[in-house]
């Protein structure tokens, strides 16, 4: 075992790969943790922070023991960049959080309101004044996973509608679609549970 650790293959290939993948793991966790903090998930963020630092210590300790190995430096930096990208991709797949959509229209507001209401979304309409006259402001609060559907409805009803999308840190009450939970932070753990259960099903077949 000692011979393998001291070999050139370990120092110039295996060790950098271990550092690379360790860095991917800890930066991915860190990226998701920061997103959870911005979403107000105060219970999930500390748990992720614990594992993030634990993996980081393991990676940096190997760097400090091999300061003359420049390949480890590249592996460390490449793992950081890759981990950031992977973390963003995972966060997009999880679609955690609540959004406020504000739509400003000067016509067809009744059709848009009706389409959104029939689709199960809560809608609030406010009269307002625009540069060129009277307009309607339509507000709806949705889950991030529903964004593409709502945008599609808006563009189908009024392709020239002006709309903006903002993050909602906290929402109290409101009308949400049936089956939508406000505690969507647990989807982070349910994602891995689903993959694990699907793997067990394949083994039992």
Swiss-Prot record:
Location of the protein in the cell: Cell membrane
Bilayer-crossing regions: 15-37, 44-64, 70-90
Single GO cellular component term: plasma membrane
Principal location class: membrane
Entry-linked CDD domains: YitT_C_like_1
Assigned keywords, A-Z: Cell membrane, Membrane, Transmembrane, Transmembrane helix
InterPro entries reported for this sequence: DUF2179, DUF5698, N-reg_PII/ATP_PRibTrfase_C, UPF0316
Annotated Gene3D superfamilies: 3.30.70.120
Keyword check for Transmembrane helix: yes
Keyword presence, Cell membrane: yes
Membrane-related topology note: Multi-pass membrane protein
Family the entry assigns: Belongs to the UPF0316 family.
Protein's UniProt name: UPF0316 protein Cthe_2213
